[in-house]
UniProtKB/Swiss-Prot annotation:
Component of the two forms of the RSC complex composed of at least either RSC1 or RSC2, and ARP7, ARP9, LDB7, NPL6, RSC3, RSC30, RSC4, RSC58, RSC6, RSC8, RSC9, SFH1, STH1, HTL1 and probably RTT102. The complexes interact with histone and histone variant components of centromeric chromatin. The gene is RSC2. The modification Phosphoserine is found at S682. This is Chromatin structure-remodeling complex subunit RSC2. PANTHER family: CHROMATIN STRUCTURE-REMODELING COMPLEX SUBUNIT RSC1-RELATED (PTHR16062:SF21), SWI/SNF-RELATED (PTHR16062). The modification Phosphotyrosine is found at Y612.
């Protein structure tokens, strides 16, 4: 009975501990600052690694409220919870400056922990102590405290090593198990997210359940097995840490070893390749973006973008050199600043422009002063740090804008073929993310790898496009001498609409999916720009439209590798690896049950398939086949051939198909009526020239001319029907970066191109009317810009302001209904004169009240229907009603 009693008691204690910790955890979300703003959103989640890589270089034990939520069920005593929760404000004060908002929030949280949570838990758990994490980096005694921690860690490492040596008599099974476990940890350490010497490579997560004992070493990385386990061998990465290694294995440190280790590093992100002054600028911008005002809005929100040139033309008359925070950030990312001082000058210019344009708004001026003070403090702090603190891997790397290999120039963002150590006939497809040079004169690049189908692990029934590649999460370093040549990878969504409008240097590959090597799964890429280097994300991708393009899909090139006894319940196999500097030698295939739903046409065994995909067993279609790209261009346009519109209807795609089939039928009918035209107008071969024969030939020639005239007339008429106009404009619009086409009603088409013929009168009239409303001074800066509005019956150019619809069904006709009727609707209306009541004939003492001017909005909405404005007569009438009665009357 005693064991059962002990077990029940332990369970009750665990349940009570969970309830107590959960209660204190939930109370954290009730904390507010003096102004009433909740502070929990600041500490709820860890900052993104992508945006704040330096955070994880400074903070060795990142903890958030979300971290506590996941760890509470695993705490065995209250001290573990206390160690973690105290770490949150300590981290915030370590990373942020003293005059920042987050530092103040951390003080509020720290005070609550000392005054409320700690006393509450102390009553129930008397052994609880408030952890002392030591001084902050800017406080005296910080270096001494860190040195003591390092010495303590070394003692623990030596003790673990001695304990491991004394346990050499353990059985072979246990030794093998521990060895496998250690190798797993070493592999994990060598993968992205664990090397503390690389800011970009450490990936923090709230999912880790760490050893509570690690809380005793707040400035040491969790998972310290890489240096203290007796079975650990040094990972392939060249760790240039100043802390000596305690491994018993000799570590080669020669140049050859450094080169091999660098190329074998599996990065999860491209490395930081910036000079110290650029990293200083990036740090300042990142901290500014997370600063929050007392009102809850971001400190930089008002400075992010410039005013709209059309809506606030006076701003560009007033400000000679407009610049926004977005412009500054773009110049920082593209390394256009050559010194930190240039960055400061632009920031001060932005503040000056803002104060000039908001000189009548004291609240905005106050915000600009706060921003200036914060910026000055951050800049001073960044400039005070030595340059060596910005060298992430212990070696200075000079960023390059260009490298030249075999007379071919390569830049960041270029697609390239890299030497494949496993198969020289299949170069690695990659995109260049970084270019740099080391002090020894060698030039390096970092590229994101794209796998070919035969290099992945996938289902045996999976289908692939011709020349398809999959994006991976591997960002590998290469010497520039590994460059073989150029290539180009196009996103599938863009390739559906047309061909890239550029000269291709090398083979063309198609990419639709991202491949996860750990889980062996394929995920469709929804946002292609997120996969590109930030230096080229804002560049336009010109496309030559191709309507009616469909894609052949082909079986897996390694389907023959499926074992004969394979079943749908087998484990997912592993690929066959070769050189660590290259993709797998060959992937693997496995079986799974048939997919009930296959929206993307990924598998040959599924029942459904998109119309733009042709699988191996599908019936062939008529069209122009391109064997090299694995595509076919049919006479039927696909739904993806048109650019995206603001108005979407389920009937539009079917209407396009109906229209195409109708046009084909008409063409066939016309073809059947055609008359043979050979030798018309001349006598038959070898026949005599008679009057009757001559008349017959003249009649045939007349019929031919009439037929040609009718055909020409039909052809001209077809150019003006609505579907043809839409198709033509679609082709023209897709050649430029003109944004989305917004279509609301058939009576107001919007064409994303400028009209250049027979519009002189319209342009002069339109400019004249706008000048009357806005004044010539406001019109001058933008009267000739692209997107000028022309109002007339029929298609028009880009609409920048929308007129309120009157609700007339003739003006609200849906676009699909307009296409179906294919007829112009006539507006039925009758002209009526404006009637006015006689104001002078009324009794002046009817009600003794002045007219209600505010109700005017209900009867005269603005902007007025179809651009109409009140007449001068009606305006005079309203003014007379508002005029006070004269004393003479």
């Amino acid at each position: 009975m005693m064991p059962d009693d002990n077990s029940n008691s332990s369970t009750q204690n665990s349940s009570a501990l969970y309830k107590d910790l959960r209660k204190e955890y939930e109370s954290l979300f009730t904390l507010k600052e003096d102004s009433g703003l909740e502070i929990s959103p600041i500490f709820n989640v860890l900052p993104p690694k992508k945006d704040y890589p330096d955070y994880y270089a400074v903070i060795k034990n990142p903890v958030s409220f979300n971290t506590l939520k996941k760890r509470i069920p695993h705490y065995t005593d209250a001290q573990q919870f206390m160690n973690d929760v105290v770490q949150i404000p300590w981290n915030a004060k370590t990373y942020n400056t003293r005059d920042s908002g987050i530092y103040k929030y951390a003080l509020v949280l720290e005070k609550y922990l000392k005054d409320t949570i700690y006393p509450n838990l102390k009553e129930k758990y008397p052994q609880l102590v408030y952890p002392d994490l030591g001084p902050l980096p800017d406080e005296p005694g910080y270096e001494e405290f860190q040195q003591k921690l390092r010495e303590k860690a070394e003692e623990v490492a030596r003790a673990n090593a001695a304990r491991a040596e004394s346990s050499s008599s353990m059985n072979s099974t246990e030794a093998a198990r521990r060895l496998r476990k250690t190798r797993t940890s070493v592999k994990r350490e060598s993968e992205p997210g664990t090397d503390t010497n690389n800011d970009e490579d450490y990936e923090a997560t709230d999912m880790d359940i760490d050893n509570p004992k690690d809380a005793d070493f707040p400035d040491l990385i969790r998972k310290p097995l890489i240096n203290i386990n007796p079975y650990t061998r040094k990972p392939l990465r060249d760790n240039r840490s100043t802390t000596p290694s305690h491994s018993g294995t000799p570590q080669p440190l020669g140049p050859r070893h450094r080169q091999v280790s660098r190329t074998q590093v599996k990065r999860g992100r491209p490395p930081i390749i910036d000079l110290p002054y650029i990293q200083r600028m990036k740090n300042v911008m990142k901290v500014l973006k997370k600063e929050v005002l007392d009102s809850g809005i971001g400190l930089t929100d008002l400075f992010e973008r410039l005013p709209d040139r059309h809506r606030d033309a006076n701003y560009y008359i007033m400000i000679a050199n407009p610049i926004s925070l977005q412009d500054i950030n773009k110049k920082v990312k593209t390394r256009r600043y050559k010194t930190f001082q240039e960055f400061q000058n632009d920031f001060n210019l932005m503040l000056t422009n803002f104060r000039i344009s908001h000189r009548g708004d004291p609240e905005s001026i106050k915000i600009s002063n706060i921003l200036e003070k914060t910026f000055t403090s951050l800049a001073r702090f960044e400039l005070s740090k030595p340059d060596r603190s910005f060298i992430p891997e212990g070696e200075l790397r000079y960023p390059l804008d260009e490298v030249i290999v075999n007379n071919i120039s390569y830049h960041v963002g270029d697609w390239a073929l890299l030497r494949n150590q496993n198969d020289p006939q299949k170069p690695i497809v990659g995109q260049i993310f970084r270019l740099w040079k080391t002090p020894d004169g060698k030039q390096w690049l970092n590229a994101c790898w794209y796998y070919r189908p035969e290099q992945t692990v996938h289902r045996v029934d999976r289908l692939f496009y011709k020349n398809e590649v999959m994006k991976t999460g591997q960002y590998r370093d290469h010497l520039v001498s590994n460059l073989v040549g150029k290539c180009y990878v196009i996103h599938f969504t863009r390739y559906q609409r047309g061909n890239p409008d550029m000269k291709l240097e090398g083979p063309l590959f198609v990419c639709e999916f991202r491949y996860n090597e750990s889980d062996k799964i394929f995920n469709k890429i929804r946002t292609w720009k997120a996969c590109l280097p930030e230096e080229i994300r804002d560049l336009d991708e010109a496309t030559i439209p191709v309507n009616g393009r469909k894609f052949f899909k082909y079986p897996s090139p390694i389907r023959h590798l499926l074992p004969a006894n394979a079943t749908p319940h087998d484990r997912v196999p592993e690929p066959t690896m070769g050189s660590p500097d290259a993709p797998p030698l060959v992937g693997a295939v496995y079986m799974r049950p048939k997919m009930q739903r296959d929206d993307l046409g990924e598998y040959a065994t599924s029942d459904d398939c998109p119309r733009y995909i042709i699988r191996p067993n599908d019936s062939p279609e008529e069209g122009q086949v391109d064997i090299e790209t694995g595509t076919i261009t049919t006479n039927t346009p696909t739904a993806n051939a048109l650019p995206k519109t603001g108005y979407s209807s389920s009937k539009l795609s079917s209407l396009r198909y109906n229209r195409s089939s109708m046009s084909l039928e008409n063409q066939n009918a016309i073809g059947q009526q055609q008359i043979p035209l050979s030798r018309v107008g001349s006598p038959g071969a070898g026949g005599p020239l008679t009057v009757q024969g001559l008349k017959q030939h003249q009649l045939q020639r007349l019929q031919q001319q009439q037929h040609q005239y009718q055909q020409q007339k039909r052809s001209q008429a077809s150019r003006y029907n609505i579907p043809t106009i839409i198709d033509d404009l679609t082709s023209q619009a897709s050649r430029g970066n003109l944004g989305n086409i917004m279509i609301d009603a058939a009576s107001s088409f919007v064409l994303p191109i400028s009209i250049t013929k027979n519009v002189d009168v319209l342009q002069r009239t339109d400019l004249h009317s706008q000048t009357k409303r806005s004044g010539r001074e406001e019109m001058f800066p933008w009267k000739k810009t692209k997107g000028e509005i022309l109002w007339f019956r029929g298609p028009s150019v880009i609409v920048n302001e929308r007129i309120i619809n009157s609700g007339d069904p003739h003006l609200s006709l849906p676009l699909n209904r307009w296409f179906t009727t294919n007829k112009k609707r006539k507006l039925e209306y009758e002209e009526v004169e404006e009637t006015m009541e006689d104001v002078t004939g009324k009794d002046k003492d009817d009600d003794g009240l002045e007219p209600d001017v505010e109700n005017e909005k209900e009867s005269l909405p603005g902007p007025f229907v179809l651009g109409l404005r009140p007449s001068a007569k009606f305006t005079a009438h309203r003014l007379s009603m508002l005029r006070p009665p004269s004393s003479s009357s």
